[in-house]
C-alpha cells in the first residue's frame, strides 16, 4: 500500500496473503501469529490430538470444543458456527439459483443451476443411486461458481477450495438427517482440527505447495468432519482425513488465465465426492493403516516444496498454458 500527497510518498506498507484468508504485514511475515494461549489440550500433531482423546474419552470434536471454551464463551462459539453454516447455506442457495456466465476472459458458463433443475425434475422418477453424487457435485459447483463471481463464501480453508466443506455438510443435511446446531458444530470442530494440523505443520496455500494444500486439505477436512458425524472414533476420523489427503498428493495449481475457475470449480466437486468416499472407507476398514495422518501431512509439505513453481498458482505451466482463451 502506498499513499501520496501530490508527488510525495507519505506512507508505505507491505502485506502478504499467506493462504486461507490470512494476511500479515511485512514485520510479522514468517513469524508465529499465535502467542501463549492456555488451552486444556494443546496439540501440534495428530498423534498428540489422539492421545488427548484416548486419555479423556472425548470425541475429537468434544476435545476441540474444550479448547474453544477456554478461549470463548459457549454462546460466542454457537453464534460463530451458526454464522458459518448460514453463510455456506446462503452461498449454495445463490449458486444453484443463478444462471449466466462467470466474469473473466474464459467466459465459463454457470452449471449448478441447470444441474439443480435437472435433478429436481428427475429425482422423483429415478432409481439411480448415483443421483446422490450429482447432488454433491451441484452443491460444490454452486459454491465455487459464487466464489468465481465474487460472491460471499467461507474460506474453509481457502477461496479456491471453498466448496468442499459446505458440499459435504449439505450432503449430510440432504441425504442423512437435517443438520442441527449440534451437528454442524461437531462437523466444523472436527474439520477445523484437521485444518489446523495442516496450517501448523504444512501449508494451505496453493502458491506454496500447489492445489494439494487447498483442495487436498479441504478434502481431508471434510472427510474428517463427515466421519465425526457418522459416529467414527477419533482414530477413524484421522484415517478419513489421511485418505482424503493421500489421494490428492502432488495435485498442481495451474489455473487457466489466472482465474479461479478452470480447473478449480470442477475440482471442488470431484474432491467433495472423494471426501465422502474417504470417510466411508475409513469407517469400514478393519486393518491398521500403514500411513498416518502426521506422515501424510509431512509428505504433502515436502512434495509441495519440491514442486516446480510452474505448478504453484503462477499459471506458467500445466493446463494454464495448454488451454487458450478465445
Locations of regions flagged by a protein language model:
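Short acidic, glycine/serine/threonine-rich loops at helix termini
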Residues: 12, 168-169, 199-204, 249-257
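Contiguous, well-ordered alpha-helical segments that form the cores/surfaces of helical PPI scaffolds
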Residues: 138, 142, 163-173, 189-197, ...
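C-terminal regulatory domains involved in ligand/effector binding and gene-expression control
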Residues: 1-125
Amino acid at each position: 500500500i502506498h499513499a501520496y500527497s501530490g508527488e510525495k510518498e507519505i506512507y508505505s506498507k507491505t502485506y502478504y496473503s499467506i493462504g486461507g484468508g490470512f494476511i500479515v504485514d511485512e514485520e510479522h511475515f514468517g513469524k508465529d501469529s499465535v502467542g501463549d494461549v492456555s488451552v486444556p489440550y494443546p496439540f501440534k500433531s495428530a498423534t498428540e490430538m489422539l492421545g488427548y482423546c484416548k486419555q479423556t474419552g472425548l470425541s475429537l470434536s468434544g476435545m476441540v470444543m474444550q479448547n474453544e471454551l477456554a478461549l470463548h464463551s459457549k454462546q460466542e462459539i454457537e453464534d460463530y458456527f451458526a454464522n458459518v453454516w448460514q453463510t455456506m447455506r446462503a452461498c449454495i442457495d445463490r449458486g444453484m439459483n443463478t444462471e449466466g456466465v462467470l466474469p473473466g476472459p474464459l467466459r465459463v458458463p454457470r452449471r449448478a443451476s441447470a444441474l439443480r433443475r435437472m435433478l429436481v425434475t428427475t429425482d422423483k422418477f429415478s432409481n439411480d443411486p448415483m443421483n446422490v453424487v450429482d447432488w454433491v457435485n451441484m452443491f460444490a459447483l454452486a459454491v465455487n461458481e459464487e466464489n468465481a463471481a465474487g460472491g460471499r463464501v467461507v474460506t474453509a480453508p481457502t477461496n479456491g477450495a471453498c466448496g468442499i466443506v459446505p458440499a459435504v455438510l449439505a450432503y449430510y443435511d440432504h441425504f442423512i438427517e437435517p443438520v442441527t446446531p449440534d451437528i454442524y458444530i461437531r462437523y466444523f470442530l472436527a474439520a477445523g482440527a484437521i485444518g489446523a494440523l495442516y496450517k501448523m505443520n504444512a501449508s494451505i496455500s496453493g502458491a506454496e505447495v500447489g492445489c494439494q494444500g487447498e483442495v487436498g486439505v479441504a478434502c481431508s477436512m471434510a472427510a474428517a468432519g463427515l466421519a465425526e458425524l457418522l459416529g467414527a472414533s477419533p482414530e477413524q476420523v484421522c484415517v478419513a482425513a489421511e485418505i482424503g489427503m493421500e489421494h490428492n498428493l502432488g495435485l498442481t495449481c495451474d489455473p487457466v488465465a489466472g482465474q479461479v475457475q478452470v480447473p478449480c470449480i470442477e475440482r471442488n466437486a470431484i474432491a467433495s465426492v472423494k471426501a465422502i468416499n474417504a470417510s466411508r472407507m475409513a469407517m469400514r476398514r478393519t486393518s491398521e493403516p500403514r500411513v498416518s495422518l502426521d506422515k501424510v501431512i509431512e509428505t504433502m509439505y515436502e512434495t509441495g516444496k519440491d514442486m516446480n513453481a510452474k505448478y504453484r498458482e503462477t499459471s506458467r505451466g500445466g493446463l494454464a498454458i495448454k488451454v487458450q482463451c478465445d
